[in-house]
Amino acid sequence: FVFTGGHGGGSFAFSQAIPAINQGLKPNTISTDLHTGSMNRGMKDLLNVMSKFLNIGLNLSEVVTATTWDAAKVIKRNDLGNLSVGSVADLTILNLRTGQFGFVDTKDKKIKGDKKLECELTIKDGQIVYDLNGISNKFWNE
C-alpha cells in the first residue's frame, strides 16, 4: 500500500494534509509532479515540499526517509535512496534552517512554518554538481 505525499499543480491541500497527519495518516513517500505550472506556484521544488511536511507534523527522519529510501523501494530501485555498497553514489547535504517561512498549497492557501530545508551540496554519480557555499573548495589563501 502506497500513500504518497505527492505534490503537483493540483494535488496537495493543507485542508486535507494537516487533518490526515493529525489523525496518524502519514505518507510513506513524498514526491513532486514537477512542471512549469507546479514549480511556479505553491510547489516550487522538492525541498519546499519536504519543508511543508516538516511544518505540518512529520519529523526530519520521516521526511527524508519518505523522500529517499521509501520512495526508491516503491519503484523497486533498492540501489537508490540509501548509502550502501553497490548503491548509486548520489548524495545531498541539507541544511535545516529555522526562522519564519511561508508555504502555499495548490489551493493558494498558506501556512507559516519555522523550518525549511536548503540544499548545501549535491553529489551525482560521485561528482559534486552543486555547492551552495563552496564547502568543497579551499579558501583563497590556502
Predicted regions and their residues:
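A conserved active-site cap/scaffold subdomain adjacent to cofactor or substrate pockets
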Residues: F1-G6
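C-terminal cap of metal-dependent C-N hydrolases
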Residues: V88-N141
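Catalytic metal-binding/acid-base residues of hydrolase active sites
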Residues: H7-G8, H35
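His/Asp/Glu-enriched, well-ordered alpha-helical/loop segment
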Residues: A13-L96
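Short, low-complexity, polar/charged sequence segments that are solvent-exposed and flexible
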Residues: I21-G24, N48-K52, K110-K115, F139-E142
